[in-house]
Amino acid sequence: MYVDFMNYMGHCNFELVPKWLFDVFPPLKYLMYTPSFHSLHHTQFRTNYSLFMPFYDYVYGTIDKSSDEQYERSLKGKEERPHVVHLTHLTNLQSIYHLRFGFSSLASKPYTPKYYMWIMWPLTLASMLLTWIYGTAFTAERNRFKKLIMETRVVPRYIFQYKSSSERDAINTLIEKAILQSEEEGAKVISLGLLNQGSALNGYGELYLKRNSLLKTKIVDGTSLAVAGVLNSVPKGTNSILLVGNLSKMAYFLSLTLCKRGVQVEMVQKDKYELLKLQLPPELHGHLVLSDSYASEVWLVGDGVTDQEQLRASKGIRFIPFTQFPPKLVRKDCIYHCTPAMVVPRTYENLHTCENWLPRSVMSAWRVAGIVHALEEWNGHECGDTVTGVEKAWHAALAHGFLPFQGCKLG
């Protein structure tokens, strides 16, 4: 399996092995090759034959003399610097195999846990320890679309670490370092994916603006486009919806937009109802209703929704998540929509992997938002309490060829 892993990594077309790894353990240079090392075999042909262990090329004199120089040059990335960076993170321990340099058979399909992957627990444990000490985000994928070069970078931390308050400062340091690196490289936009834009973690990205007031790279949390994606999933003619789960920036702007459109927003928890009511303009209070019923046919589901709440839903109810992560599938007689996402245009290049649980050629609305922000050359940030505008973001995405994704399934 090690040989297979190294083979996949060697053909991923970009350099991801950090230099400090060889500085800490110099003999590793002879035991493990890098993508840039193997790329010379395809360009120079009679050098760097090794598929995973350069030791034999050194022994038999087939090592390319420019290997170290090529490695350094690839790390610096002088040839192609990204215009847009999407910053995501690892989810569970098996998710590292779902990246492009993991197993292509897994990365090309929507992520689902595989029971047989547990036989690789020694390698999984080693990868967890490596990511724990790894001090920077790494590049997992590069793409092209129109005039833009995009990169997906991964913060080497898992969900359980994001949920730990003791890890908060370290994670913020990693994210801020990635933002400043993107700024140094001339990136126009950096979009924050998954938990990298948490309210408790960094105030939806606002923390980094406070620390770096002269930041030129625009921070995008993607709220506007994600809200638009959720609203597009609500069936036409819907007069009322039930809002459940934790309150958030997404919950507020969803409620605000729905109330402005004359749709009744129902809530069942009084404390959350009172808090949201304080945030909404007084003229919209009549559209926000405290209900003692779960009878609404459309539920907008946030983080924190319980199994007991789902069990109170009537048969055939639509659960539409407005969160980064899909809800637990509790009901087999109800319809579960996908998290906010869009289908990418056919001209989007080099998209060979699935983004987490999304199908091939489908991208989360938060990631699309960063790309659209750069294409439109919008000057403002979308983080903290600021939004680009729901209609503005939606129409811009459609104009650039992104299409609504209406993925749904029975529980």
Where are each of the predicted segments found?
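Short, well-ordered secondary-structure micro-motifs within conserved domains or adaptor modules
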Residues: 291-325, 335-337
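Cytosolic/stromal cytosol-facing helical appendages immediately following the last transmembrane segment
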Residues: 1-124
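Glycine-rich phosphate/diphosphate-binding loop of Rossmann-like nucleotide-binding domains
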Residues: 235-302
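Adenosine-phosphate binding glycine-rich loop
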Residues: 146, 318-411
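Short, charged/polar "capping" segments at the starts of alpha-helices
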Residues: 197-203, 272-278, 307-309, 327-330
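Metallocofactor- and cofactor-centric catalytic cores in central/energy metabolism, strongly enriched
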Residues: 116-219, 224, 228, 282, ...
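A short, basic/flexible loop-to-alpha-helix module at the beginning of a structural domain
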Residues: 224-240
